[in-house]
Amino acid sequence: MTNISGAVVLVTGANGGLGVEFVAQALERGATKVYAAARTPRSWDDERIVPLRLDVTDAASVAEAAKHAGDTTVVINNAGVGGPEPISSAEFDDIRSVMETNFFGALAVARDFAPVLARNGGGALVNVLSVASWIAGMGAYSASKAALWSATNSLRLELAPQKTQVVGLHLGYTDTPMTAGLTVPKEDPAVIVRNAYEGIEAGQLEILADGPSQQVKARLSASVEANYPQLGNPLNDLQ
């Protein structure tokens, strides 16, 4: 388990809906400092918040951020973008762009900050995933989150010897700028972040932060046909 009280927290994608909540609630829970990392850092009105330039798609930027924020004990790997769909016809450059941010960018942050966390006692690395890690329907976004989920599982084992708590945070649609154009039920970002921090402090390694993530995880062992009824039974076409 990792306590947020007394921690030094780094949040990537700190300018977005979830990012702002991660910053605010870390301070509410007693974090002594929060690095608010973003490609174009914004100003904050709290001296405990340190704006930090970090472009997750730029290796030099990630390395410099890890050097500058060397006292970090909790990393919230939150930066992400939406993606094109369907994946069968989207431009490859667009798909690669999503993978660069959501997978390779998040992995770069994890790799460069792992030694920082080790030096500071282990701490926690939290990868913000999605129900899209487990289900299709969101094109390149689903593919990128599935890749990061797999990497999270590997990182959990690889960083265990240095006592780093590696957490996969899963959530469904959340009311953020990324989902502004979608007319679907959305969870309040404040609820997601509260559940995330509570899970971290409880020592959880996988956090299902809302109803949709809990429901999707529960049915993963079902057949492909059960999870995707729109497919029907392809064998019927052969009879």
Predicted regions and their residues:
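Rossmann-fold cofactor-recognition segment
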Residues: 46-59
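Residue(s) in the substrate-gating loop at a strand-loop-helix junction
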Residues: 130
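Substrate-binding pocket helix/loop in short-chain dehydrogenase/reductase
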Residues: 86-87, 94-96
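Conserved NAD(P)H cofactor-binding loop of Rossmann-fold oxidoreductase domains
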Residues: 78-84
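C-terminal helical subdomain
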Residues: 168, 176, 180-219
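Active-site helix of classical SDR
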Residues: 110, 144
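N-terminal Rossmann NAD(P)H-binding glycine-rich loop of SDR-like oxidoreductase domains
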Residues: 15, 19, 23
